[in-house]
Swiss-Prot record:
SMART domains: EFh. One of its GO terms (biological process) is bioluminescence. Ca(2+) 2 binds at D147, N149, N151, Q153, E158. This Ca(2+)-dependent protein binds to luciferin. The luciferin of LBP is capable of reacting with luciferase and O(2) only when calcium is bound. This is Luciferin-binding protein. Ca(2+) 1 binds at D111, D113, D115, Y117, E122. It comes from Renilla reniformis. Disulfide bonds: none annotated. Residues 10-45, 46-81, 98-133, 134-169 form the EF-hand domain.
Length: 184
């Protein structure tokens, strides 16, 4: 089925939120520096050891590499959001599945203690690293939205369902408003 103008506008709003959140330097561009700074912020917020902080930094640099963000490369937030919407909305089923699976790199970045689950403190550190305006209460609400079975942790499966909804969903959902905080 053809994507309607309102569905496209909603999807673009999600991608703009994502890109604005990733632009932690606030310069209007997405760059490798942003991903490195997210890792530094998470390490500080989560009080990671030097070793864990470096592991987290390396994982975020892998995300930057996956996105083609070599040192010195930057793309405007607006262009990144439009490109993401354009490419995601025309993906075939197999490509969508691969995109969702590739997002597990981000899961591994957020799972700083490497126990295979994202805890509330880990998710909160990530959310507040990309959204310093996100309060503790909002972070908890977002976490609880993603923790479908209410066991106090976000599993890889729960994360994949959320990513699929965020990247490909065309209708407003609670999940979309929890992944990077409220849509901007």
């Amino acid at each position: 089925p053809e994507v309607t103008a309102s569905e496209r506008a909603y999807h673009l709003r999600k991608m703009k939120t994502r890109m604005k959140r990733v632009d932690v330097t606030g310069d209007g561009f997405i760059s490798r520096e942003d991903y490195e700074l997210i890792a530094v912020r998470i390490a500080k917020i989560a009080k990671l050891s030097a070793e864990k902080a470096e592991e987290t930094r390396q994982e975020f640099l892998r995300v930057a590499d996956q996105l083609g963000l070599a040192p010195g490369v930057r793309i405007s937030v607006e262009e990144a959001a439009v490109n993401a919407t354009d490419s995601l909305l025309k993906m075939k089923a197999e490509e969508k599945a691969m995109a969702v699976i590739q997002s597990l790199i981000m899961y591994d970045c957020i799972d700083t203690d490497k126990d295979g689950y994202v805890s509330l403190p880990e998710f909160k550190a990530f959310l507040q690293a990309v959204g310093p305006d996100i309060t503790d209460d909002k972070a908890i609400t977002c976490f609880n939205t993603l923790d479908f079975n209410k066991n106090g942790q976000i599993s890889r499966d729960e994360f994949l369902v959320t990513v699929n909804d965020f990247l490909f969903g065309l209708e407003e959902t609670a999940l979309a408003n929890a992944f990077y905080g409220d849509l901007l």
